[in-house]
Design a protein with these regions (language model features):
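Aromatic- and glycine-enriched beta-alpha-beta binding-site module
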Residues: 60-94
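Short glycine-rich, low-complexity/disordered patches
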Residues: 20-24, 137, 190-192
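Charged phosphate-binding loop/patch that engages nucleotide di/tri-phosphates or the phosphate backbone
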Residues: 171-192
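N-terminal strand-loop-strand
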Residues: 39-74
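Unchanged
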Residues: 80-175
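Acidic, metal-coordinating catalytic segment for phosphate/diphosphate chemistry
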Residues: 14-50
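Residue-level signal for pocket-adjacent positions within structured domains
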Residues: 33, 42, 67, 74, ...
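Predominantly extracellular/luminal regions of secreted and cell-surface proteins
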Residues: 1-26, 97
Length: 192
């Protein structure tokens, strides 16, 4: 079953973060009940993946100013049929940043999500409002690369870690950034 790895990942995340059980259970319910949960056509929501992207030294983070949503967000997007959410996060980060050399910030063999979130996406054009069931990872960029803005954004920018509250106005982005800051302070992330 192609969704079993994600269900296992959600179970491990839920066990490690019992305070986030409600969100983990919402995503699990979608994956268990919707055959097409990895397709953007799945309504009322579908699986997405995203990445908090750090500079090689961990002192800065990269956000995109999303064209449709008009706000600063982490890089990420639709699974488009791919059940491997870690691969989706990596693919989307590469596409949206122009950075080819990225790696997961964990020493473990298997990428571990740092956060889960279910958030509402407003209707846009012919697309109805729907939920993104987002699995979030931390990536680190190799040194010496130049960022390139994609057509999905109006801006792409590196920010100092202490500027998080000045830049982000979305609660889920703030929560994600604060989690990463705590992990950096605890030296729990592997940088370049």
């Amino acid at each position: 079953m192609h969704r079993k790895p994600l269900l296992d990942l959600l179970a491990r995340y839920r066990a490690a973060h019992p305070d986030e059980a409600v969100c983990a259970d919402r995503i699990r319910a979608l994956v268990e009940t919707q055959r097409d949960c990895f397709e953007r056509s799945c309504l009322p929501g579908h699986v997405t993946a995203s990445a908090w992207l750090l500079s090689p030294d961990g002192k800065r983070f990269l956000l995109t100013h999303h064209r449709k949503l008009d706000r600063w967000l982490q890089l990420g997007g639709h699974a488009d049929g791919d059940a491997d959410v870690a691969a989706v996060a990596l693919r989307e980060a590469r596409e949206e940043s122009g950075l080819a050399e990225l790696r997961f910030a964990w020493a473990a063999d298997t990428p571990v999500p740092v956060d889960l979130d279910v958030h509402r996406i407003p209707a846009h054009g012919s697309e109805p409002a729907h939920d993104h069931h987002d699995v979030r990872f931390v990536l680190v960029a190799a040194p010496g690369q130049t960022i390139f803005e994609s057509d999905e954004s109006t801006a792409l920018e590196w920010f100092d870690m202490d500027a998080l509250e000045d830049v982000a106005d979305d609660d889920s982005v703030l929560r994600l950034g604060r989690k990463v800051r705590r992990l950096l302070a605890a030296s729990a992330l592997q940088l370049f």
